[in-house]
């Protein structure tokens, strides 16, 4: 499997903090041909072991991703959210997102806010719902969205929102 295909498979996983199981599953499958065993501990850590008498090496990386947790659904069907991890209003505005159930949306800005004054509370998720009732058939308060941005190559470089460790 090519590196870009591996990154695309990992990007496709829904893995916000506390829900990294899908990511661990993909990593387990990817690692299986190269290791003797893969186990998951009580905290959800994936531990892959390659037997041998040579020097020991540890590769450590997080599997979770930044998330946006739905905190309120308004009468227009827009979703207010809180951060799961470090979020900046300036960085997340306009970002496509997806929920575990496949619902997709985008981070939008309410009204006219000066860039210097923009905060997370000025943002909302637009999932295309016409009203609150329709939105509630798509997502619930407490559901978490992650970035819905694919890995891709351009100019000999690889781009992905999950290149920090995952």
Per-range role (PLM):
Residues 1-166:
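N-terminal hydrophobic/helix-forming segments and targeting peptides
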